């Protein structure tokens, strides 16, 4: 295997060097002068060289989970689909967060000195949406695009630039993600739109979403929270990572049932961040919200953290949230990707599970959580608040967007089951209180 060396930039600054040796093993070392945000919480700033087992999970987290998608990209560039360094050499100019990878001769491009936007018509966007529905491998990216998105769902990224949608060429940062839902689940993109809007209405920070139609193709359009427009009108990147990356776990193990991260793993990671109180509170709200609406895909890759210098970090807004209760087959055996206090059955999250979530039977963890403001009383109050508010807020969202195609059908199949789930949570807590 060919040796390879890629410059690694974070927020446009050279942060270090990613290397691959002749055996295919990768490593990363920070530049001696770099003082910015760490590449990952698993790789704090240091003069050491981080080895293959630490670096590899982070790199794979930047790539699509789907092996078919990775194979399609690999075939385009004639590299191996299981070689993240080789893939990022070609599509690493616009990754999740603020990290960029490039060869030394691409540094000008990576720093934005060689970039451009290509405007798209509604018809062209409709064609891209239709293509990922028919065969998501075909439209992972267009020619001359250099972005990469993690995850398993068909999607593509564009930029809103000068009042129009554009493809990004060179290192131009994308600003929005387009997806038309998980194949096989009716109105799934609309489902996600409603669940995201509901979460925001109950007070949980979420990525901005809109539901748009391009000719006859509907899409959920998600504004990237890891992008911001500065005072000069330029788009800046914010560095972030998901919790598989933050815990050094490969995306293939993102589900707890597959040996992936647990709520306790995330709690323990957040305790060591600043401000840990706010991060733990928000994570609890997000976890309980996913549980109460029966979201089956709220695994560790669907929680992320925005990184600052040192241990400064802020839990990222919610994203990729949709209820499984809208679908009869999932209602019958609904399971959560990440349990609450060891309980992953939707509708069974009762007082015992909530108490176990507060410490998981570990006195040291329980004390740390309580000291951080995450008391058992707070956990019960959070679940009850959500159980009261979610049915009201979800119905308000559905009514506000009643004219969207498919909304009446979604109301019929989702609102009732979600309300029932909320009522069961309240009943279990009330029964415990006597």
State what each model feature region is.
Residues 1-300, 304-434:
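Anionic ligand-binding catalytic core segments
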């Amino acid at each position: 295997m060919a040796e390879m060396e890629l410059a690694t930039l974070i927020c446009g600054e050279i942060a270090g060097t990613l290397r691959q040796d002749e055996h295919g093993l990768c490593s990363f070392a920070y530049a001696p002068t770099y003082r910015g945000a760490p590449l990952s919480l698993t790789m704090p700033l240091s003069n050491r060289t981080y080895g293959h087992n630490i670096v590899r999970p982070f790199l794979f987290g930047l790539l699509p989970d789907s092996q078919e998608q990775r194979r399609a990209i690999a075939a385009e560039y004639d590299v191996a689909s299981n070689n993240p360094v080789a893939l990022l050499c070609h599509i690493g100019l616009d990754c999740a967060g603020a990290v960029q990878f490039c060869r030394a001769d691409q540094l000008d491009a990576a720093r934005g000195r060689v970039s451009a936007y290509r405007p798209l018509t509604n018809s062209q966007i409709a064609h891209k949406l239709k293509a990922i529905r028919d065969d998501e491998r075909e439209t992972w990216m267009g020619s001359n695009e250099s972005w990469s998105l993690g995850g398993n769902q068909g999607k593509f990224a564009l930029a809103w630039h000068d009042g129009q949608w554009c493809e990004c060429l060179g290192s131009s940062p994308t600003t929005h993600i387009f997806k038309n839902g998980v194949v096989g689940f009716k109105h799934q993109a609309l489902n996600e739109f409603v669940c995201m809007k509901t979460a925001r209405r109950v007070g949980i920070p979420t990525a901005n979403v809109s539901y748009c139609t391009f000719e006859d193709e509907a899409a959920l359009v998600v504004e990237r929270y890891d992008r911001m427009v500065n005072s000069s009108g330029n788009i800046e990147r914010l560095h972030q990572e998901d919790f598989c990356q933050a815990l050094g776990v490969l995306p293939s193990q993102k589900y707890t049932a597959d040996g992936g991260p647990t709520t306790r793993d995330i709690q323990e990671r957040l305790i060591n961040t600043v401000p840990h109180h706010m991060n733990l509170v928000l994570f609890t709200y997000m976890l309980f919200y996913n549980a109460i609406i029966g979201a089956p895909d709220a695994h560790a890759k669907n929680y992320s953290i925005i990184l600052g210098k040192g241990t400064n970090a802020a839990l990222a807004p919610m994203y990729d949230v949709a209820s499984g209760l809208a679908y009869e087959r999932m209602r019958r055996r609904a399971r959560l990707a990440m349990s609450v206090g060891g309980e992953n059955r939707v509708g069974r999250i009762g007082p015992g599970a909530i108490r176990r979530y507060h410490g998981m039977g570990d006195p040291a963890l329980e004390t740390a959580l309580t000291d951080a403001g995450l008391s058992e009383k707070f956990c019960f109050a959070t679940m009850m608040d959500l159980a009261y508010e979610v049915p009201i807020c979800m119905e308000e969202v559905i009514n506000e967007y009643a004219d969207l195609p498919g909304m009446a059908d979604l109301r019929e199949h989702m609102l009732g089951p979600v309300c029932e789930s909320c009522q069961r949570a309240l009943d279990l807590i009330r029964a415990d209180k006597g």
